[in-house]
Amino acid sequence: MTATVSHAGPQVVILTGVSGSGKSTALRALEDAGFYCVDNLPIVFLEKLLELSGHTAGEVSRMALVVDAREGRFLVEAPRIIRELRQKGADVEVLFLDASDEALVRRYSETRRRHPLAGEGGTVPDGIAAERLALADVRGIADEVIDTTTLNVHELKRLVTRRFVAGEGAKLGVTLVSFGFRFGIPTHADLVLDVRFLPNPFFVPELKPHPGTDPRVAEFVLGQADAKAFLERLTDLLGFLLPRYRNEGKSYLTIAIGCTGGKHRSVALAAALAERLEGSGQPVRLWHRDVEKE
């Protein structure tokens, strides 16, 4: 008998990706946010789980599950399974977590664990290569891919929480991330803007110790004629882009604004842009990634 999923079905997040990329961390973040979470659920049981959730009087409205490369049927049948669940009313999103080979090798070295696909006598790089090959098709159908190479545990948890929890109901979720080029460009960003053309408060002794959230630093940065012109033009550009992204079915946009260290200029400008967007009715999630780094 085929299970029936109502059109008011639960929100389902399928977490997948390479081993060591942070799937367990992402799952914990969603569990903390109130999702019903299952680790390594065989995909054949997902439809049954959704059917049972329909008899819980709304108690299970959001669920997340981890599926990895050892779930052979998911790798083969993922597109069909996800398509059928969506046709039956389930709100299914696939999040694929990735990281560079170097980062994965380092993480396995730190935990002293064997790679699950390394095989007898195989090395961690062997396992990584085998897993990438096995997951290639699944990566291709993911709604979003997040590269966790430069993210620590806390940054990944914040990112996942903002992605699936904050600002619910918005047709297009916008996240503004201030960052420092010194610490790397956010790999999950859709748009990257470089504001190092502006005078740097770092070289003003009385401003150097204070972040861009400090009114004195913000006044110094935003008081520049070029900063004002930049904000005007960027606001106009986003006013053009956001509805068109939305019309094309994009549900999430990350805009990264960077300066040298991520403490002064990018912070002030990201906050000012967030204020402008929110003033126009666009919900915004603001994250100052590197403001506390030295």
From Swiss-Prot:
Q: Which domain of life is it from?
A: Bacteria
Q: Which key words are in the record?
A: ATP-binding, GTP-binding, Nucleotide-binding
Q: Does the keyword Cytoplasm apply?
A: no
Q: Does the keyword GTP-binding apply?
A: yes
**Which residues take part in binding ATP?**
G17, V18, S19, G20, S21, G22, K23, S24
Cited InterPro entries:
AAA+_ATPase, P-loop_NTPase, RapZ-like, RapZ-like_N, RapZ_C
Spell out the molecular function terms from Gene Ontology: ATP binding; ATP hydrolysis activity; GTP binding
Q: Name one Pfam family in it.
A: PapZ_C
* Residues annotated as binding GTP: D68, A69, R70, E71
Signal sequence, start to end: none
As for what it does, the entry says: Displays ATPase and GTPase activities.
For this chain, the family text in UniProt reads: Belongs to the RapZ-like family.
Q: Which NCBIfam families match?
A: PRK05416.1
- Under what name is this protein listed? Nucleotide-binding protein AnaeK_0154
This protein's species is Anaeromyxobacter sp. (strain K)
The top of its lineage is: Bacteria, Pseudomonadati, Myxococcota, Myxococcia, Myxococcales
